[in-house]
Structure formats: C-alpha cells, structure tokens
Amino acid sequence: MNNPNHRLSPPKVAGAFLAGIIMVAQMSPAYSQATADERNTIEVFKRAAAGVVHVKAVRVVATEVGDAVAGQGTGSGFLIDQAGHVLTNYHVVGGSSDVKLLLGGGRTFDARLVGTAPAFDIALFKAETGGAAGTDLLPLPLGDSDKLEIGQKVLAIGNPLGLHNTLTTGVLSGLSRDIPGAPVGLGQAFLQTDAAINPGNSGGPLLDSSGNVIGINAVVARDGQNIGFAIPINFVKKILPELISMGHVYQPALGFSALPIPPGMATLLGLSVHSGLLVQEVAEGSPAGIAGLRAGGRMIPMNDTVYVLGGDVLTAVNGKSVTSPHDLTVFLLGSKPGDRIQLTVVRGGERRTLVLTLPPMHF
C-alpha cells in the first residue's frame, strides 16, 4: 500500500506526463515499424489493461468525537470473471473498512468482500455494479504457472504510487523462491522477476507474453534492485473455489511438526533416505497421532537448528514426494474434512504406509 503523503503534486504530475508525451512522440516508432516483441507488448497491454483494477482502501476507527480516517492506501487487483470478482493481496486491504475498485474507463464501484486467506496473502472482492450487466467487464485469463521457464518474458501492470495502469516488463528470474517474513502458507512458492514492482503494484497481475495471468505481484526486495516476487496463479486457483463458496480456506491441523532433511546431511545424520521430512513432534490424539505417526527422541544441533532424530521420515503423500513443509501445504489445498490421505514414511529403514483422516473444519 502506498503512503498517501508520498505523492507528486498536481503541477509536477502534469509536467511529468507532458514530458512523457513529448518523449513518446519523439522516440517511439510507429506501430507498423515496431519490432515483433514490441508489438507483442503493446497488444498484451491493450487487452489486459481494462481488466486491471486500482484498489483504494480506507481504514476508519471510532474516536470520542466520531469516526476518523486512520489510514488509506492504494494497491492493484484484476478481474477474474464477468461476475465482477477481483483478486488482490490481503496486505493491500487487511483491516480496511471501505474498499473502492477503479476499473478501466474510469468507473468506480464499491467492493464487497467475498473471502480472505491471510496465510496466503490473498483477498477476493466483488465489484458492486448495482445490477448493471457485466458483459462489459473484461476479466483476465488465468494461465498455468506450473509450466514456466526462467528467462521467459513477463509483464506487470499495476498502480505504483497511484499511477493507474503502469506497465513494466522483464523476465522470469527464478522459481520456487522462499522469502523471509512472507505469509506462512506461501513458503517456497514465489516467482521472481526483474520487472519493476513498486508500492502500489501489490495485487496486480504478472502476465506471460500471451496475456495470461501467471502470478499476483506481492513483494519487492527492499535491499535490492529489480527483484520482485509474485504468488503463482496455480497456487491461487486451488483456493479460489473455497474463497467463493465459504469465504475462507480449509487448512487442516494434522498435529505434527517436521523439518526437511538438510541437503547433503542424510549420511551424517545416519538416515537411510536423502530427502523428506523429519517428524519432530506428534500431538497425542491428533490426526497424525491417531494415524500412528511417530516422532524421535534424540536431539542433534546442526547449523543453528536442533533436529530430533529417531522418528519417522515422511517421504510422500498419496504417492507424491514431499521434501518441505510447503509441499504438504500445497498438497492439502482443496482437500475436505474426512478425506483420507496416505502417508509414506521410513521407520527404522523400512517403508510403511499410514492412513490419516483429515479433521473437521474449525471456525
């Protein structure tokens, strides 16, 4: 969110825009003379810009003399369907008492909160169009973030410093990044890009060269340059149905804690497998405890971390490899209370299969 005091004064804004217009007139080639890559950028922006939303959030608190505005800021979002659903970051709107959505063409709508997932930094709103037909809304197509390659072109559209529909371009710089201090549910999920992402871009779309949303821009590295991060759209697609139907995400508490096996340390720790999760603690009576999962009792300090050895090593869930707690989080997205999942563990050098029943939903 932007600091409302960090804004250009109107004369400076007008001057900056005028200078930009003059530069474009002098330097930009005619569309017919643009390179193929430039034409692609232009076309993607033209198609996507109308679906990008300027999010304005206000937090109002009661005082002894009446309500007072405690804070306000701006961010970005984007339409995902013609019903008017808009995705953005939770940190853009968290704690807000009033949210406005500025759509393409200058239309402003009140926003109705549909659902939030703070652990994943996701919020879903719906534009209150007052019964107007949604056929003129232009949602953005959601792509496939599991089929990305480092080096491919990406485009970010948002509202940095309140500048509506600003476009920046770059490449995909990294995959599966772990960001310290990020929401706990995201873990090693982030996409990294060198496309400029600034305050106000949060919640906006990261697009591929076909104009498909591959991520939601979320984080900028404060101590670096040209280092931004986005939440993969496939991660978001897994929780969308629950946000729409329930307003929140089912996150079952399994009742155990685990740490990944340190790279290259399996032999030193006397383990028979080289990847998986070392079960550290199991709560009595929990779903994991009932399933028969076991923790160890021998503690070894290593690299500022104390590992509990001698217990189960979780290697797979329903046949899919698990190498980090984040893998388990992703697997459980979209699951339902009562679902039975198979845990593959190594105990005493032997593989075993345990069956765990997911617990009821708690509100």
Which ranges hold each PLM region?
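Bacterial N-terminal signal peptides
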Residues: G15-Q26
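Serine-dependent protease modules
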Residues: Y31-S275, Q280-E284, M302, P325-T329, ...
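Conserved PDZ fold ligand-binding element
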Residues: V86-L87, I290-P325
